[in-house]
Regions:
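Extracellular and organelle-lumenal recognition/adhesion modules and their flexible linkers in secreted
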Residues: 4-6, 28-283, 300-302, 310, ...
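N-terminal export signals
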Residues: 7-27
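Conserved, mostly hydrophobic/aromatic
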Residues: 53, 150, 241, 294, ...
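Solvent-exposed strand-to-loop "edge" motifs in beta-rich extracellular domains
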Residues: 151-155, 193-195, 589, 646-648, ...
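Noncatalytic carbohydrate-binding groove/subsite architecture in carbohydrate-active enzymes
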Residues: 203, 365-537, 605-619
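Active-site groove signature of glycoside hydrolases
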Residues: 330-363, 450-453, 505-513
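Aromatic/acidic polysaccharide-binding cleft in carbohydrate-active enzymes
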Residues: 506-628
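Carbohydrate-binding surface patches
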Residues: 623-666, 670-673, 712-713
Length: 719
């Protein structure tokens, strides 16, 4: 008989010693760990959407477009541009702008006859001297073909060529000659094949002759793109087993108008996105494109709507656009844009972090409760079958945000200093989940929780600041899982205060989670881009274990770095899995719809340094098998038995399993990630140092040896 959540967690933690909240000393491991697994005590099936990824901004690095600001949201000027970011991820969004070619004053921004932006480049010709615009720092691969288009208008005396240049020699480029121009914008195809690979190619749009010509927009992509997306990323995301994508944010959504992403891609208006430092958003990835991505990968869409500047009417129209028949006004518009069949989007997130003053359209908690109800009631009037996620925050999420503010982690003159002591109190004006659950409970299906951890920091309750800690690997890796655990502690507190919540089937969606790597002073940062060896993969594995244990309380999750867990070459194409990507693949391809089983042990987990309900809970997370973390489960058909073991230490350990309630066949498999050392990582152009190794097993050993810095998944058929 399935166990309820409290019985399941109580069984899993039966051997865990209760530790004082302020305890910072760690018990030493002695002897072999004794583990008991009772297969008759299984939990609810794991929702496949736990294995999700998160996309922000609207047009992400998954998109194959090579040109920055291709619709000219920003003017082209003679002034020297700001240096382009060196990081390949950010180059895609804040990269090299178009520059004028020719003497000063050659290029003007015409606001009278713009193509799609508020202005378009107007090039003044000067006879035989080539004049126009160019964009540098393009990344091309040897022998790789690139295709695109350009919209041009101009005088008949203008002779225009478009050239892809990959070197300095006369033969180190390829040219497309444009037929004669007309006063009206026309679309011309482009196609190039690069003879060499370089990260400093450039696209030139040049004219000679007399008169002027306008550039409306230009586009260039690898020819092997799949509906506009990088082919390698589609292949690897599908292989990894992503089952949900959240889009278009994140902070991005609170100033995003979904209608900007409809219609002909080249004619969608570009915008300067205020939530991303006025980055030029071309709106190339719109609603239809996002749905196409989900279908290519086999993932469910999770659409975030703008509850900041956006209205209830706009949200309802978006639901009708996605799910309405062609007989409805918005459904007819969807059909006119190429999709007569409804998208049938079921998951909708109402805004993002609306508790934060950094959010466009931020308002007080009492006002937001009213707005949330207005929006959801309007949406469900259109389609009662949709599920909505409230943009709230437990006091844990709010308290971590307060701790970041106290440490000035994200400087802003618009956010007031934090005067209150942390953690915030339940029922206070900072308790967004508490108030929303009280005032909006009939309009909530899921609770959003954004869960970020700092592996090298702990919040000091006395100093009221994050401080540097020098913990062993197992505690650094476990901080993220502890943040997951404290969210469930907060839920239990809400149920205690509002008993009627027991009758509601409200679940969590951890729609942003990950690690942030920095010191208390801010040195050594680099966020998700920093190379960390096996720290991230171990942390991801422990986080998944904790979420799967709470299968009855989680509807979905989205790793913030989930869509960047692939390796990209110097052209931006995905060519393999990063180390954390392998962990996600291992978990996502084995635990879909699995039934977690209670695990007991004789080695309780240890309480981490920090402050309860800020950066950790009041009790440790994980199975009572310290320092190992063990998760057992049946596969969805109950024909296979799984034991997943994470060893987040730099030494080997062993455990003796005692399994009851099921009989296993001897023949089995072991899928194992066990690299040579902690610093092991995968790099482009090199043989992977971290792999998933598969070996046959002849029965589960009486004593299981677990290598250092490893994730091991045993699979046996049920007899």
């Amino acid at each position: 008989m399935p166990m309820n959540r409290r019985e399941f967690l109580a069984a899993s933690a039966a051997s865990t010693a209760m530790l004082n909240q302020g305890m910072t000393a760690f018990a030493a491991v002695t002897g072999n760990i004794q583990v008991t697994i009772d297969a008759s005590k299984s939990g609810d099936p794991v929702n496949p959407m736990v294995f999700g990824g998160y996309m922000e901004p609207a047009t992400t690095s998954v998109w194959a477009e090579m040109l920055t600001d291709r619709k000219f949201a920003n003017p082209i000027t003679d002034a020297a541009p700001a240096p382009a970011p060196t990081n390949s991820f950010f180059r895609r969004f804040f990269g090299e702008p178009f520059k004028p070619v020719g003497p000063a004053g050659t290029v003007a921004m015409d606001t009278v006859r713009p193509f799609v932006a508020k202005h378009s480049p107007l090039v003044k010709l000067g006879g035989t001297e080539p004049r126009g615009i160019q964009q540098s720092k393009l990344r091309v691969g040897r022998g790789k073909t690139y295709e695109g288009c350009i919209y041009l208008a101009g005088d008949t005396g203008a002779k225009v060529v478009v050239r892809l240049v990959w070197g300095r020699g006369a033969g180190e480029s390829q040219t497309v000659t444009i037929p004669s121009l007309s006063p009206e914008y026309k679309k011309f195809p482009l196609k190039f094949t690069a003879a060499v690979g370089t990260e400093d190619a450039r696209l030139e749009i040049l004219g000679t002759g007399s008169g002027t010509f306008h550039v409306g927009t230009a586009s260039l992509m690898p020819a092997d793109n799949v509906q506009g997306f990088h082919a390698g990323m589609i292949r690897l995301f599908k292989e990894a087993g992503f089952k949900m994508f959240k889009w278009p944010g994140g902070n991005f959504v609170s100033a995003y108008d979904w209608r900007d992403g409809l219609g002909d891609r080249d004619k969608r208006p570009p915008r300067l996105q205020p939530m991303w430092s006025d980055r030029a958003e071309p709106n190339d990835v719109g609603l239809h494109d996002f749905i196409a991505l989900c279908r290519l990968v086999g993932a469910e869409p999770d659409l975030a709507i703008d509850s900041g500047f956006g209205s209830a009417r706009e949200a309802a129209e978006q639901v009708e656009y996605c799910n309405g028949s062609v007989e409805t006004r918005m459904g007819k518009m969807r059909a006119e844009n190429g999709s007569p069949e409804p998208f049938n989007v079921r998951c909708w997130c109402i805004g993002n972090e609306m508790y934060g003053p950094w959010q466009y359209g931020h308002m007080s908690l009492d006002q937001y409760c009213v707005k949330h109800n207005y929006i959801v009631e309007a949406m469900k009037k259109v389609d009662p079958k949709i599920k909505v996620t409230v943009s709230g925050a437990s006091i844990c999420e709010k308290s971590v945000g307060g701790a970041e503010k106290k440490g000035n982690f994200f400087p802003s003159i618009w956010e007031p200093p934090i005067a209150e002591r942390l953690p915030y109190e339940f029922g206070s004006v900072n308790d967004w989940d508490g108030r929303l659950l009280d005032k909006c409970v009939d309009n909530i299906d899921y609770l959003s929780e954004h869960t970020y951890a700092y592996p090298d920091l702990a919040f000091d309750a006395e100093k009221q600041l994050f401080v540097d800690v020098h913990d062993p690997l197992q505690f650094r890796a476990r901080r993220l899982a502890n943040r997951i655990g404290e969210a469930f502690e907060a839920w239990d507190k809400y149920v205690e205060k509002m008993p009627w919540l027991k009758e509601k089937d409200i679940k969590f969606i951890f729609d942003e989670w990950g690690n942030r790597l920095r010191s208390a002073s801010g040195n050594g940062g680099g966020g998700f881009m920093r190379q960390t060896g096996m720290l991230m993969p171990l942390s991801y594995a422990l986080c998944f274990h904790e979420m799967l244990r709470h299968s009855d309380m989680i509807a979905a999750s989205c790793a913030t770095g989930g869509l960047r867990t692939v390796l990209t070459d110097n052209t931006g194409e995905a060519v393999g899995f990063a180390t954390e990507g392998l962990v996600m693949k291992l978990m996502q391809t084995n635990f879909l719809n699995a039934y977690p089983i209670a695990v007991e042990g004789d080695s309780p987990q240890q309480l981490l340094p920090g402050t309860a309900l800020v950066d950790r809970g009041t009790k440790p997370t994980g199975s009572p098998t310290y320092p190992l973390d063990i998760l057992a489960a049946f596969t969805s058909d109950r024909k296979k038995f799984l034991i997943s073991v994470v060893n987040p230490t730099e030494v080997g350990h062993s455990f003796t399993p005692k399994i009851s309630g099921v009989k296993l066949r001897d023949q089995g498999k072991l899928y194992q990630i066990a690299p040579p050392d902690l610093s092991s990582t995968n790099e482009v152009g090199k043989e992977p140092a971290v792999k998933i190794n598969e070996t046959a097993q002849n029965g589960l050993p009486e004593t299981v040896l677990v290598p250092a810095v490893s994730v091991s998944l045993y699979e046996f058929d049920v007899a």
